[in-house]
């Protein structure tokens, strides 16, 4: 047997368990000369199939299984490409099927693409004669060995192969159950799904007509198609007046260079070099295309990032507006982006604000045509955790067992079932019974198979021809996709550009828009000063919550130690704070603060490493060192850098000799050459592209600038981006309060779905209120825009439709203070809800009928709700306090220590808090303990109560009260938590503090005369405490006398002072 003509691979999603590599391996073992891939309706697997076959000297045949219909009957059909034209026909046929979601193919559609195909009808019966007869003039039409005889039609033996061996039949049933969302025991007749890969011995045992087998070879020999890689498929840019792209590009570049206030001669020299490299490689159209779409974005209110990746190292990119990073100013290398000695497609990735990215994609589609632009397919796979749960589900495991499985497989990226099996608890689960062992066996066979398709997050393919001429297409959720992955499409030669959506650009754009609208200030982010000391003070304090690249706890810690003073410090931090180079951070900080400690292996390293204090941080530095010492061109230096990062021993040894020889010819001793090579080899693994670091540091700086100068607008927009996450919202509210920003309750006449900045503070989003959905907010805001602000609560009730105006909505709005601006207490408005809901307040408001038919609404004024209840409702509906936290409300004036004021060094200092969360757990020894979250209204702190303390204080933790806690700080993973040693209710603490006071200090003597009889000149007994007066104006303490704690007037004396005017010691 020399060929298999009907292989269904795992890319026939959930229909086959046969991986391409396994199909090829089996073919090799059986001395098969040719394989045909024939997945149903799709060509997903073509590139991998082609590569695997060629690598193993097997002839690849490209085909597809379809279902052909005449409207009445349907016949399974295999179509095979005879040549490259047939291959293109397959692309288009599959594209037609997938783009139009066709289950069946009409014989008319098949005829359109059949000239260069071999057609094999399967299991043809009498009812299919009409379909077969349509193709009677088609010379390469066959029927399979299970079909009836039809005059003039040859038969061929063809076996649908979709799993490896006979023992793997259960995989097809399992895949069918997963696909159909049913139970495994409901799937029957596995034979209908296909067969295993038959061995030559098994085929010989079958009673097959020899002529049928002969036709297999005939068909295999007729098929001769191949995938063509690295084609020149770049689209051509339409220039004005049909000017050549080269001439037009040069004219645009020189014109732009003359506009800029730069050293013309220096920049022109660099420009000529880059232009020559680009045009010699034939990439002039590419740069013009990218420039055009970025120009569209910038002129259509879509914010574009300053650059991404190595493209910021190109002066051409800078002059075309593709980047806003001057590569000469920042000492960036063009060869890191485009290497003239290693011809590859340039890779320009573009960041757009995420909320408007689709506008640019739509522009590209309109410019080039719908069939000329597509996204890129990606595949989700049955990885360990997913396959374990899927197979458990179809085998009928209950939810408890499924959850047990999930808990037994670690949350580790890329973990395999074999790795999980090394864990004792997982192994015990597998061998608990025969059912579990069968479950594990099926899981192992399905692990790694593609399960579903999705869309690549960023990649867009563009061509000036319909894309199905070069690759098959399918339909995704938001448009067309190539059926091949990003790397496969690029290997063919198609132009791929990454259109990435960056949330931080949306935040910046929104801030700029609001500042211009509200304050009349037009901020040009290209003209802001990049040496603003207030920005560097913010960074030095680590106040970088919400700032791109700088908001993790680890980076904040580094910033506090480093104390950035200039932009280069930000670039360095964003490059160093990654696995690998992190170990150099202490060295960098030490040298940054004391440059005398900088040491260089050789003086010629100083010009290259001076800005980074002798530490190699950037890939460009490695290239510069190779150029300086070994006289490498930057192209050669980039090849060296790539070789070092890939750690290919043979290539590395060759490059080492190349480097040492070059250094020798350049006048360096062999010993120092070897040391320099070893130095750059050490850092090559994690050197960071400086061009990318500069680009992203610019975004970080811009956000820092906006946070410093427009904090209300900054925090409002950061908060708007975390709507829906109660935890993140509470964290950002907490951070904003720490910065002194007033958080205002939702205001029915000011608030939107998003947070609204104002001069007074930030209005909370109406969408933050639990139980108030987006549609309700939309109705409220739309009504306000169309008919003006609401005059009062009853006006609101009249204008909002009944379907929205529910008791639940009204109560929520009232209890968070959304109507406070109308001057009525929340309790008064709660009382008015019945009037609103009982009366018909949605009568048409035009004309006097409204006045006659609408009953007069009256408020029944009530006293305001108690402060504690107001705070409780705000916490319930918003997840945090707005009016005032209980800690703030009553006790900050007494100068208690709070989390916000607590330093890491203040162990065992009593602090005033509420317990936000108490999570009780049981230790391995069966003892109870708890993890808690403490809150003081401004900041939260994680705490832990170990078993001994938990026994003492468990009962207290059930009370919603204010507490004084103390303990010791523990620092892990750069986060602090308090190991709690003691807990007291505030009331108990106050009593004890009063009972044991040794001195009373007052700051206001206005009440003193009322208690003159209590004050004694000298101490007479143990119950007497010192009474002192502290004069703030002269900063002096005076002893007034003594008072007796047992005196009947003592408590009255204490209560007569404002909390801020008295202190007990």
From Swiss-Prot:
It comes from the Bacteria. GO terms for molecular function: 3'-5' exonuclease activity; DNA-directed DNA polymerase activity; nucleic acid binding. InterPro entries: DNA_pol3_alpha_NTPase_dom (IPR011708), DNA_pol3_alpha_thumb_dom (IPR041931), DNA_pol3_finger (IPR040982), DnaE2/DnaE/PolC (IPR004805), DNAPol_HHH (IPR029460), NA-bd_OB_tRNA (IPR004365), PHP_dom (IPR004013), Pol/His_phosphatase_N (IPR003141). It catalyses: DNA(n) + a 2'-deoxyribonucleoside 5'-triphosphate = DNA(n+1) + diphosphate. It is found in: Cytoplasm. Keywords: Cytoplasm, DNA replication, DNA-directed DNA polymerase, Nucleotidyltransferase, Transferase. Coiled coil: none annotated. One of its GO terms (cellular component) is cytoplasm. One of its GO terms (biological process) is DNA replication. Pfam families: DNA_pol3_alpha, DNA_pol3_finger, HHH_6, PHP, tRNA_anti-codon. Its EC number is 2.7.7.7. Belongs to the DNA polymerase type-C family. DnaE subfamily. PANTHER family: DNA POLYMERASE III SUBUNIT ALPHA. DNA polymerase III contains a core (composed of alpha, epsilon and theta chains) that associates with a tau subunit. This core dimerizes to form the PolIII' complex. PolIII' associates with the gamma complex (composed of gamma, delta, delta', psi and chi chains) and with the beta chain to form the complete DNA polymerase III complex. DNA polymerase III is a complex, multichain enzyme responsible for most of the replicative synthesis in bacteria. This DNA polymerase also exhibits 3' to 5' exonuclease activity. The alpha chain is the DNA polymerase. This is DNA polymerase III subunit alpha. It comes from Staphylococcus aureus (strain COL). The lineage of its organism: Bacteria, Bacillati, Bacillota, Bacilli, Bacillales. The gene is dnaE.
């Amino acid at each position: 047997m020399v060929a298999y003509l009907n292989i269904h691979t795992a890319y026939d999603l959930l229909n086959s368990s046969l991986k391409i590599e396994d199909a090829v391996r089996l073919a090799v073992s059986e001395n098969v000369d040719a394989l045909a891939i024939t997945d149903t309706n799709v060509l997903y697997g073509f590139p991998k199939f082609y590569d695997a076959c060629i690598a193993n000297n097997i002839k690849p045949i490209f085909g597809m299984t379809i279902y052909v219909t005449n409207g009445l009957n349907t016949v399974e059909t295999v179509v095979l490409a005879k040549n490259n034209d047939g291959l293109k026909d397959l692309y288009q046929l599959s594209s037609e099927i997938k783009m139009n979601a066709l289950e069946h193919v009409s014989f008319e559609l098949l005829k359109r693409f059949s000239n260069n195909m071999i057609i094999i009808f399967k299991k043809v019966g009498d009812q299919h004669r009409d379909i077969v007869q349509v193709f009677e003039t088609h010379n390469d039409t066959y029927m399979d060995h299970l079909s009836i005889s039809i005059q003039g039609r040859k038969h061929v033996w063809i076996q649908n192969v979709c799993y490896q061996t006979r023992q793997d039949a259960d995989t097809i049933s399992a895949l069918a159950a997963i696909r159909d969302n049913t139970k495994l025991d409901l799937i029957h007749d596995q034979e209908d799904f296909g067969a295993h890969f038959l061995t030559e011995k098994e085929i010989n045992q079958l009673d097959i007509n020899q002529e049928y087998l002969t036709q297999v070879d005939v068909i295999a020999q007729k098929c001769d198609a191949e995938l063509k890689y690295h084609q020149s498929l770049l689209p051509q840019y339409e220039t004005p007046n049909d000017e050549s792209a080269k001439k037009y590009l040069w004219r645009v570049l020189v014109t732009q260079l003359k506009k800029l206030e730069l050293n013309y001669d220096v920049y022109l020299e660099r420009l000529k070099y880059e232009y020559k490299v680009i045009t010699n490689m034939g990439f002039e159209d590419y740069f013009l295309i990218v420039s055009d779409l970025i120009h569209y974005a910038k002129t259509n209110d879509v914010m574009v990032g300053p650059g991404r990746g190595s493209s910021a190292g190109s002066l051409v990119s800078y002059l075309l507006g593709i980047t806003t990073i001057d590569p000469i100013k920042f000492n960036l290398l063009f060869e890191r982006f485009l290497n003239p000695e290693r011809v590859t497609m340039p890779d320009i990735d573009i960041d757009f604000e995420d909320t408007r990215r689709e506008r640019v994609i739509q522009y590209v589609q309109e410019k080039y045509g719908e069939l000329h632009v597509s996204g890129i397919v990606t595949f989700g796979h049955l990885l360990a955790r997913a396959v374990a749960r899927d197979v458990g589900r179809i085998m009928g495991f209950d939810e408890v067992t499924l959850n047990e499985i999930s808990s037994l497989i670690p949350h580790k990226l890329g973990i395999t079932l074999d790795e999980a099996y090394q864990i004792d608890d997982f192994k015990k689960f597998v061998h608990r019974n025969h059912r579990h062992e069968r479950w594990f066996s099926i899981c192992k066979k399905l692990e790694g198979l593609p399960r579903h398709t999705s869309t690549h997050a960023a990649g867009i393919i563009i061509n000036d021809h319909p894309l199905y001429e070069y690759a098959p297409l399918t339909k995704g959720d938001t448009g067309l996709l190539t059926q091949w992955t990003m790397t496969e499409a690029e290997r063919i030669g198609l132009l791929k550009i990454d259109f990435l959506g960056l949330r931080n650009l949306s935040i910046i754009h929104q801030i700029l828009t609001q500042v211009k609208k509200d304050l009349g200030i037009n901020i040009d982010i290209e003209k802001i000063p990049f040496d603003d000391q207030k920005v560097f003070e913010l960074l030095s304090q680590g106040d970088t919550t919400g700032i791109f690249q700088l908001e993790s706890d680890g980076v904040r810690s580094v910033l506090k130690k480093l104390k950035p003073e200039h932009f280069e410090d930000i670039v360095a931090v964003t490059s160093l704070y990654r696995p690998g180079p992190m170990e150099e951070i202490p060295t960098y900080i030490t040298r940054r603060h004391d440059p005398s400690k900088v040491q260089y292996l050789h003086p010629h390293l100083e010009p290259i490493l001076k800005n980074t204090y002798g530490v190699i941080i950037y890939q460009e530095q490695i290239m510069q060192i190779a150029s300086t010492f070994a006289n490498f061109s930057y192209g050669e230096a980039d090849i060296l850098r790539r070789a070092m990062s890939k750690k290919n021993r043979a290539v590395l040894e060759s490059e080492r000799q190349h480097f040492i020889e070059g250094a020798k010819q350049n006048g360096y001793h062999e010993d120092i050459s070897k040391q320099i090579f070893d130095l750059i080899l050490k850092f090559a693994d994690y050197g960071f592209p400086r061009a990318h670091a500069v680009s992203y540091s610019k975004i970080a700086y811009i956000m820092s600038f906006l946070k410093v100068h427009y904090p209300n607008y900054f925090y409002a927009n950061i908060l708007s981006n975390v709507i829906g996450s109660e935890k993140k919202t509470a964290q950002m509210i907490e951070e904003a309060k720490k910065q002194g920003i007033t958080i205002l309750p939702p205001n029915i006449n000011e608030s939107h779905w998003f947070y609204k900045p104002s001069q007074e503070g930030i209005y909370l989003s109406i969408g933050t209120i639990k139980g108030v959905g987006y549609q309700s907010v939309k109705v409220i805001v739309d009504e306000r825009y169309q008919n003006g602000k609401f005059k009062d609560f009853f006006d609101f009730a009249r204008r909002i439709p009944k379907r929205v105006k529910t008791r639940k909505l009204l109560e929520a709005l009232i209890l968070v203070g959304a109507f406070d601006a109308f001057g009525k207490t929340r309790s008064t408005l709660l009382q008015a809800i019945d009037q609103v809901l009982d009366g018909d307040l949605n009568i048409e408001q035009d004309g006097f009928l409204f006045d006659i038919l609408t009953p007069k609404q009256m408020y029944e004024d009530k006293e305001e709700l108690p402060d504690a209840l107001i705070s409780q409702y705000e916490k319930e509906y918003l997840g945090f306090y707005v009016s005032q936290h209980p800690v703030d409300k009553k006790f900050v004036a007494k100068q208690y220590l709070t989390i916000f004021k607590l330093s890491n060094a203040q162990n065992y200092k009593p602090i005033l808090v509420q317990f936000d969360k108490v999570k009780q757990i049981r230790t391995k020894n069966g003892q109870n303990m708890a993890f808690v979250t403490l809150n003081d209204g401004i900041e939260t702190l994680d705490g832990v109560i170990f078993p001994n303390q938990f026994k003492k204080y468990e009962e207290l933790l059930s009370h919603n009260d204010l507490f004084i806690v103390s303990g010791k700080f523990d620092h892990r993973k750069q986060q602090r938590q308090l190991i709690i040693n003691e807990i007291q209710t505030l009331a108990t603490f106050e009593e004890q503090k009063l009972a044991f006071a040794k001195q009373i200090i007052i700051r206001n003597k206005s009440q003193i005369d009322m208690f003159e009889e209590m004050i004694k000149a000298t101490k007479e007994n143990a119950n007497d405490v010192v009474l002192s007066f502290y004069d703030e104006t002269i900063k002096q303490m005076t002893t007034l006398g003594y008072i007796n704690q047992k005196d009947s007037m003592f408590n009255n004396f204490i209560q007569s002072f404002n909390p801020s005017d008295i202190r007990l010691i």
